[in-house]
Swiss-Prot record:
Organism: Arabidopsis thaliana (Mouse-ear cress)
UniProt-listed InterPro entries: Ig-like_fold (IPR013783), MSP_dom (IPR000535), PapD-like_sf (IPR008962), VAP (IPR016763)
Keyword terms, alphabetized: Acetylation, Coiled coil, Endoplasmic reticulum, Membrane, Phosphoprotein, Transmembrane, Transmembrane helix
UniProt KW Membrane keyword: yes
Protein name: Vesicle-associated protein 1-3
Entry function: May play a role in vesicle trafficking.
Entry membrane topology: Single-pass type IV membrane protein
Length: 239
């Protein structure tokens, strides 16, 4: 806790859980230590484009507290060794009773004669978003190789399951392909047989038609021969 004559500020450092491409927030609390005076505050930072402070100005009533939320914008790169040089400055000054947050102006924090301004500097600290799990006190070094073997066995089992699943999926697809090929082969064989059957029926029909035509010519020839015989017989009788 940072303590002055007018306010207490907690915490003394702004700790942000750091994770790439994600926003992160933390808060600080300002408590008015006085019992009779209103205190105005203003929060500034060395990197205003990187942080958003809500509220960045305000008035704290006697004995009251105010929470300030600081949001760090999503970062594309991690700083070297997770060290941050950004800092925040909290300025406080006594204001008259009835002063509202909208009436807090930058000129109020100018250090003029007779005006007491308290400054508090807070540094920024990055902490891992997901800190490593602590090792139980009862664990021994001799157990670590066994744990590693268990991890390897678990990874191997998982890999085997993935390979088996992939093989089964491939086998199912192969079975479907062979079934489709077999079906197409049967359809092709059936179509060939139908074609041969139609060809035989057409050949038989052609032969029957040819026979009928031959029979018709023979009958006509016999009629002509008979008629010719009658004519010749008639002529012979006349002679």
């Amino acid at each position: 806790m940072t303590t002055g004559d007018l306010v207490n500020i907690h915490p003394t450092e702004l700790k942000f859980p750091f994770e790439l491409k994600k926003q992160s927030s933390c808060s600080m609390q300002l408590t008015n230590k006085t019992t009779t005076q209103c205190v105005a505050f203003k929060v500034k930072t060395t990197n205003p484009r990187k942080y958003c402070v809500r509220p960045n100005t305000g008035v704290v009533l006697p004995g009251d507290s105010c929470n300030v939320t600081v949001t760090m914008q999503a970062q594309k790169e991690a700083p070297l060794d997770m060290q941050c040089k950004d800092k925040f400055l909290v300025q406080t000054v006594v204001v008259s009773d009835g002063t509202t947050s909208k009436e807090v102006l930058a000129e109020m924090f100018n250090k003029e004669a007779g005006r007491v301004i308290e400054d508090f500097k807070l540094r920024v600290v990055y902490i891992p978003a997901n800190p490593p799990s602590p090792v139980p006190e009862g664990s021994e070094e001799g157990n670590s190789p066994m744990a590693s073997l268990n991890d390897i066995a678990s990874q191997s089992a998982s890999l085997f399951d993935d390979v088996s699943r992939t093989f089964e999926e491939t086998s199912e697809k192969s079975s479907e392909a062979w079934s489709m090929i077999s079906k197409l082969t049967e359809e092709k064989t059936s179509a060939t047989q139908q074609s041969q059957k139609l060809r035989l029926e057409l050949e038989m029909l052609r032969k029957e038609t040819s026979k009928k035509q031959s029979g018709g010519h023979s009958l006509l020839l016999m009629l002509l021969v008979g008629l010719l015989g009658c004519v010749i017989g008639y002529l012979l009788n006349r002679i």
